[in-house]
Amino acid sequence: MSVLNVLESHVILHIIEFLPDHEKIKFMSTCKSLYEFRCHVTYNNFYVYDTINHLDFVNKFKKLIYLSIFNENSKNYDPTIIVKSIKDVIPPNTKCIIFDDDFDEDITEFIPEGIKYVVFGIHFNKPIKKILPNSIIHLILGFSFNQSISDILPCGLIELTLGHNFRQSINDIPNTITKLIFDSEFIPEIHGKIPTNINCLGIRGYFGKNHKKDIPNNIKHLIIGTDYHSKMCEVIEDSIDMIITENMTHITLGWNFDDTTFNIPNGVTHLILYQKFNPTIIKCLPSSVEHVEFISRW
């Protein structure tokens, strides 16, 4: 007997909502009856608006990227027509804004209330005081950003990434943040300054001589050197063991750990290893490890 004959439509729809977008499509493509659900499920990945705007269920896509091409060489170009704010031209259902890498302009009144994800590009380095709505939950400050973040971060912010050139104080991080990533070659003094609500800490640039006392006990997921090709292993005193605490359950280890040996503590359940990682440096894996993931090639 078909599952469609056993379960009510709303039950099937509820089950589908638990699947990632690509699995939803696969599942609904198995038969004509299920395919009819495509107009009723929610799609949570990022999609370019121009690729899906022909569909009748555009409102089911929650994260749309709007792209526009402006030709300054156009014969119809009028240099006196200047858009002073894009707040009023951003569609009301927009949840994410990604700034181009070349963008480095004042963004006063750029970001409307309701935006949840904001990503600044490589060259952006303008003050952002009083311009970030409290609806933002995920903020990435790009490579060049080096402005004060004191008293300017949204009160509902959950994830914060600080870029490569960041050299400012982190004393005023909102207590709502649970994930903090340093992409910088400069790591500020973090001892006693990481809020207790943060459970994921990423140090993906120059690590410096940090110790276990600098990593609060509330950190469950530690990310080290994932994206930035640094020389962090040359400055870590004695061993990685010095900064891995017993409370951690998830550890992500990036590049340049070839010459370091360390133990994975008991209690770690997830281990992610990136390329250029020498697997022989791990002395042993505790029985608590349930998931090991190898990213890219060895």
UniProtKB/Swiss-Prot annotation:
InterPro entries: FNIP (IPR008615), STK_FNIP-Repeat (IPR051251). This is Putative F-box and FNIP repeat-containing protein R286. Residues 4-48 form the F-box domain. PANTHER family: FNIP REPEAT-CONTAINING PROTEIN. Keywords: Repeat. FNIP repeats lie at residues 124-165, 255-297.
